[in-house]
Each structure stands twice: as structure tokens, then as C-alpha cells.
Amino acid sequence: MTKTIKEINRLLEAISELSDPYFIELESDDRVGVKKAVNKRRKAIQAMVDEELRLDKMLSYEKVLYQEGFSLIAGIDEVGRGPLAGPVVAACVILPIDCKIKGLNDSKKIPKSKHLSIFQAIQERALGIGIGIVDNHVIDDINIYQATKVAMIEAIKNIKGDVTEPDYLLIDAMTLETPIPQQSIIKGDANSMSIAAASIVAKVTRDRLMMDYEKAFPGYDFAKNAGYGTTSHLNGLKQFGVTPIHRTSFEPIKSML
């Protein structure tokens, strides 16, 4: 008896390999609906294969370190170097060996709608997470580059969880003054699972802070622009002036004082 397209779709959903013989069996079915269902499932499986390969590639730095005997590898990244207002936030995340988190990538490449679910997945699976926050006053005193380093060191010191002391650091494009062995990786948030996890944690943490600042200082659209120099933010500056969380060493704030 010929199966309905609905029945075929149900069977296709159970297939997870492109080499499954059921695909060959369906090639003789000329129904347009069947061909669409087959193509859709093949694309879905290929997407899963591609994602698995991408995640494997993102573990390449970690795998080298596993082979060298390191197991408590912390990824470190920051968010908030460029905004005109608010702190710079760093995160330090220690993931279990060979941990893969679906969808994890550089936070700038992930749709904002998915940030929270990936953040929650990191919280559930991480062995330890630390946060470092350096406010705008310190940024103005020592410059954003040095403030970023301070935030990263604070994140390491503040690790909480089952593991609080990493044995190796993978850092996004920075070198830190710490006795812990480390490696600086250019575009690390796109090439290391551990750094990408830190990127998301730092991003979600800072976004939440900026949403709180939106309530304290309405009119600058902080909840949406996170302190970056958007049109709405610049309009707020013209209308309401500089707030206590603005970076006075950054233009155009500096010229407004």
C-alpha cells in the first residue's frame, strides 16, 4: 500500500544519515510532495552535519591542549570596548572536555533572539564561570585597553562552580599578566568553543546591565543600543546631556564637557 506524504514525512524525520537507504527507495516516487519532503530532510541532515563539523573545528585549540595534559581550559572574552557608555564586561568559562554547545559561535554572529537559550546551555554545562566588570570611571582613568585586561583578570578571580581554578587560558586577542599558561587567539570567539562561550556570557551579562541603566537613565535607548553611539543615543545626549555612566574620555562625550 502506498504511504501518504504525511506518513513519509514522519519516517523521514527519524532518519539522521544521508546514506540511509530509504532515500534511495523514495527516488522512484514521482509525487511532487514526496520529492519536496526528501529534499527538505536531506538539507536538514546536511545542516546538522555541517554544524557538527563546525563545532569540531571550534574545539581544535582545546583538543591540542587536551593532548598536552590540560583539562581545565578557560576561555576568556570581553564585551563593551567600543560603547560610549557603561562598563566593559569580561567572562571566563571552563567547559568540560570535548563539550559542544549547539549554535555556539562568536556572539556577534548569533541572532540576539538565541543569546539567552545558548547562555542558559552554557550555565548548565560549564564547570565554572567568572565575570569581571570594570566601570566607565576606571575606563576613563586607565584607558579601555587596560580596563579590558583588568576585567579579564577579575573574571578569572571570580570563577564560581565545580571548578574555580583553570590550568590553561585561551584568550581572545589579549595577553594577561598571570602565572597561568595562556594562548592569545585572534578572532578567538569564532575559533574556540571556550572563548565563544565566554563571549556569550559577557554579552548577555552586559546587555542586562544596560537594560537596568535604561530604567535609571531613560532617553538614551540603552536597552537597545547597549551604550553604542547609535542615532538614538546621540540624540539622547543632545537632549539630556551626559550621564554618570558615560565615558568622558570618549568622543563626542569629551567635547561636550
Curated annotation (Swiss-Prot):
One annotated Gene Ontology cellular component of this protein: cytoplasm
Keywords assigned: Cytoplasm, Endonuclease, Hydrolase, Manganese, Metal-binding, Nuclease
RNase H type-2 domain: residues covered: 71-257
Binding residues for a divalent metal cation: D77, E78, D172
Disulphide connectivity of cysteines: none
Compartment(s) of residence: Cytoplasm
InterPro entries on file: RNase_HII (IPR022898), RNase_HII/HIII (IPR001352), RNase_HII/HIII_dom (IPR024567), RNaseH-like_sf (IPR012337), RNaseH_sf (IPR036397)
EC number: 3.1.26.4
Major localization class: cytoplasm
Catalysed conversion reaction: Endonucleolytic cleavage to 5'-phosphomonoester
PROSITE patterns hit by this protein: RNASE_H_2 (PS51975)
A Gene Ontology molecular function term of the record: manganese ion binding
Entry-linked HAMAP family: RNase_HII_B
Stored NCBIfam families: PRK00015.1-1, PRK00015.1-3
Record protein name field: Ribonuclease HII
Source lineage: Bacteria, Bacillati, Bacillota, Bacilli, Lactobacillales
